[in-house]
Amino acid sequence: DNFKKLYNDSDVTKRNRNGQTSSGLYSLFIPMEWNYEGFIDSFGLPVFDTPGTPVEGPHGDKIDVGVVEHWENEADGLKDDPDGLNEFYRQFPRTEEHAFRDETKNSIFNLQKIYEQIDYNDGVLTSGAVTKGNFKWENGIKDSRVIFMPDLNGRFNISWIPSLNLQNHVITKNGGKYPGNEHIGAFGCDSYDISGTTDGRGSKGALHGLTVFSMEDAPINSFFLEYIARPQTAEIFFEDVLMALVFYGMPLLAENNKPRLLYYLKRRGYRGYSMNRPDRTRNKLSTAEKEIGGIPNTSEDIKQIHAAAIESYIDKFVGLQEDGSYGNIYFNATLNDWSKFNINNRTKHDAAISSGLAIMACNRHLYQPKHLRQTKVLDFGFKKYNNEGSISKIIK
């Protein structure tokens, strides 16, 4: 992570007025096809594409396959070995994303689909799919309207903005505020309670928004918002979350073992935006759960449900689809976090925790407890008679 940060801080296209990058260095990435042994012609030039006629190499050998096709054939041969495919990408990278992939062993998710989506996101077609920015209260007046302001240094990544009639859809009931677009989607959040840590490396806050099928003008089963940041204070993070909820008009499922965010929402009058845990009926909730909502994400059964939710989403909606299209999650940070997710050590996986809660929130009907209806035969003590013949007889 430190080397990747150094590399990103050395982007030559992002220099200050003195002509310096943030690190004072210039980054350089050379894709593997530019210098792959066995695919250089006699003039020292790479043979990128398969030639119509064989090309002579520097030692007189014939080159009849382009390096790109050779690379794709090797990758295709590893499609049933996700760990091997990941290692192949790391050793022979064609993109910066390939070069910075971590070593991944025994991933519990479908790495092939995750990598298909990452490679697709790196393509030209998705370059404008994500906008960075921040949410602001209109004219600085809290609890009014929320607006989105594009900003290259913003904390939010978004791929969909609802139409004006869907923005800031707040319903007021019994003096409380409730989301007006809960039929369109929901949010998941991995919060934190402490503003700072002694080493400055505390986990980040994460927020993800996901849509479901609806009749509204909105994408279907699409992650439309990604927020992975740790502002200077926890209150800034809480306000960021609140503004996103209000702007999209959707409810939130958050961890309640770190409850400051949920108390913040309640104090501001937005308790109606905090979902109760979907796996229990209201009369089974604890006192704190009734007060602020949320779900404890520490028990083993919740961990398994959470991981299964992500796994199901990846299998259905990530990577290459049966119709030849690709999934519409354009956030590579989240995809990379899924690829590295360790269910036994989830502390560093803020994006995976948050996105999994969003999936659970959108599929909350799957976790609702089922009530078994039992029928009981009641004996009212009525006498029964046999009316055959001229005289009826009591049935004993």
Where do the model's predicted regions map?
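Short alpha-helix plus adjacent loop in nuclease-associated cores
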Residues: 274-319
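Conserved AAA+ ATPase "SRH/arginine-finger" region at the nucleotide-binding site
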Residues: 30-35
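RNase H-like, metal-dependent nuclease domains and their acidic two-metal-ion catalytic environment used
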Residues: 1, 5, 19-24, 36-277, ...
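Short mixed-charge
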Residues: 5-19, 282
